[in-house]
Regions:
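Bilobed "Venus flytrap"/periplasmic-binding protein-like clamshell domains
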Residues: 33, 38-42, 46-61, 114-173, ...
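Acidic, polar ligand-binding/catalytic clefts
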Residues: 57, 61, 66-132, 143, ...
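Extracytoplasmic small-molecule ligand-binding "clamshell" domains
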Residues: 20-99, 168-171, 256-257
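Bacterial N-terminal signal peptides
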Residues: 2-14
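Periplasmic-binding protein-like
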Residues: 37-38, 109-121, 201-243, 257-276
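Ligand-binding clefts/hinges and TM-proximal coupling segments of bilobed small-molecule sensing domains
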Residues: 22-24, 66, 145-165, 240-276
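Solvent-exposed, polar/charged alpha-helical surfaces in well-ordered, non-transmembrane soluble domains
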Residues: 53, 57-61, 81, 85, ...
């Protein structure tokens, strides 16, 4: 899900000079304090297994500082009770344009996806308007943009809704949706690409279909930034420089996890040599 879920120009010294680096007064010198969900795979967890954990490590490495997390389940009040309360200084994945925070430059762009069985009746499907969906059962996360597209296509009656805002320590709507797909309770699952892509990599019998052919509104593709407190301009410039210098490393991690990435023309990036 969109952490619905980026961007950082101070030049920092070498590792040998880390203790002498100047960091903005509003963030913690010597430590990158990241706000994160403790059970939100494939994005983050306390074991450091998510792709946002890996990206946080890249940022800390470039800054030559230690990495520390402040853990809180995502949901209403997440920004207020993390960044706002100054327990941490950076959210690794945040949709561009979202209010409440200041954003870095986007560091990747992704898209919502359909997930179907490779050998099933929907194999080769490319868009929601495909007539084969008319009599199929469609799993959809409530309140996400694809739900509006399905409504416009008259497919709401065919949908099985899954919750958007949950405590991922207790339940996982995405895993439930994929289980229902594998078990035959639904015929197609629709998920945010950075969530669906890594799940599909674990199931060879499933196919990920980026929704690249849908109408523009509401958007199906989103730019992801990093988020920080408003008015921390020096910190924003610092992180933007990190993102620029380590873009290739970040893209490599995202592709390794199976996150579908788009270039500026809306085409899929298939190697870490592609543009952000």
């Amino acid at each position: 899900m969109i952490p619905f879920a980026v961007a950082f120009g101070l030049l920092l010294g070498s590792a040998a000079g880390a203790s002498a680096q100047h960091l903005p007064d509003l963030v913690t010198p010597g430590t990158l304090r990241v706000c994160a969900d403790p059970a939100n795979m494939p994005f983050s967890n306390k074991k450091g297994e998510g792709f946002e954990n890996r990206i946080a490590e890249i940022v800390a490495d470039e800054l030559k500082v230690s990495l520390r997390y402040y853990w809180l389940p995502q949901g209403p009040g997440f920004v207020r009770n993390t960044l706002g309360a100054r327990y941490c200084d950076l959210i690794i994945g945040y949709a561009a344009g979202t209010e409440l925070t200041q954003h870095t430059n986007p560091y990747y762009r992704s898209v919502f996806t359909m997930i179907v069985r490779r050998d099933g009746p929907l194999a080769g499907i490319e868009e929601l308007a495909d007539p084969r969906l008319r009599d199929k059962r469609i799993g959809i996360v409530e309140g996400t943009p694809p739900a509006d597209h399905l409504a416009d296509l008259g497919l709401v009656a065919r949908t099985t809704p899954y919750s958007l805002l949950v405590d991922r320590r207790i339940e996982s709507p995405a895993d439930e949706m994929i289980s229902d797909l594998l078990g035959g309770k639904i015929d197609v699952a629709i998920l945010w690409g950075p969530l669906g892509g890594p799940i599909v990599r674990k199931h060879a019998e499933l196919q990920l279909v980026p929704l690249l052919r849908e109408k523009e509104r509401p958007p199906m593709a989103y730019r992801i930034t990093m988020a920080m407190r408003p008015n921390e301009l020096e910190w924003k410039h610092t992180i933007n420089n990190v993102l620029r210098r380590r873009q290739a490393d970040i893209v490599k991690v995202l592709l390794e996890y199976g996150v579908p990435l788009l270039d500026e023309e809306g085409g899929l990036i298939t190697s870490d040599d592609g543009p952000p």
